[in-house]
């Protein structure tokens, strides 16, 4: 997907399927930095552009490169204990009764009138 939101006119969009070259310890240039350098060379101001610029990283960060040493990956894991604290407010007797009645299970008994079966002598069935 990527950040290819603004392409058209004089804007050039790099292909997302291009093979990215690996770099050593050089800082990763971004599109906004390259665009600023291009604007500076052309003598135009940044606010004169017609569309907003979105920062897109041209090279993958070093942390995304896979290493064969799995123990170093495990040593980079950090776990955090998260505690959610909620202050309990005291309830009045009326509030407790209302809350209990709202969450209480209601039961009902349904009584249907008993049908008296009648025999139909023509068909030989109960009606």
From Swiss-Prot:
InterPro entries: DUF4578. The keyword Chloroplast does not apply. It holds the Pfam family DUF4578. The modification Phosphoserine is found at residue 63. The modification Phosphothreonine is found at residue 30. It comes from the Eukaryota. Coiled coil: none annotated. Residues 51-75 are annotated as: Disordered. Keywords: Phosphoprotein. Signal peptide: none annotated. PANTHER family: CHROMOSOME 11 OPEN READING FRAME 52, HYPOTHETICAL PROTEIN LOC689959. This is Uncharacterized protein C11orf52 homolog.
């Amino acid at each position: 997907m990527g950040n290819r939101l603004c392409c058209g006119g004089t804007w050039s969009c790099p292909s997302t399927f291009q093979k990215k070259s690996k770099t050593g310890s050089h800082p990763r240039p971004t599109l906004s930095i390259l665009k600023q350098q291009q604007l500076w060379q052309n003598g135009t101001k940044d606010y004169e552009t017609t569309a907003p610029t979105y920062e897109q990283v041209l090279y993958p960060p070093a942390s995304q490169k896979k290493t064969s040493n799995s123990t170093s990956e495990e040593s980079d894991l950090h776990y955090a204990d998260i505690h959610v604290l909620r202050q309990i407010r005291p309830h009045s007797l009326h509030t407790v009764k209302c809350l209990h009645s709202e969450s209480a299970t209601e039961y009902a008994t349904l009584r249907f009138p008993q049908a008296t079966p009648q025999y139909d002598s023509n068909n030989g069935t109960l009606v």
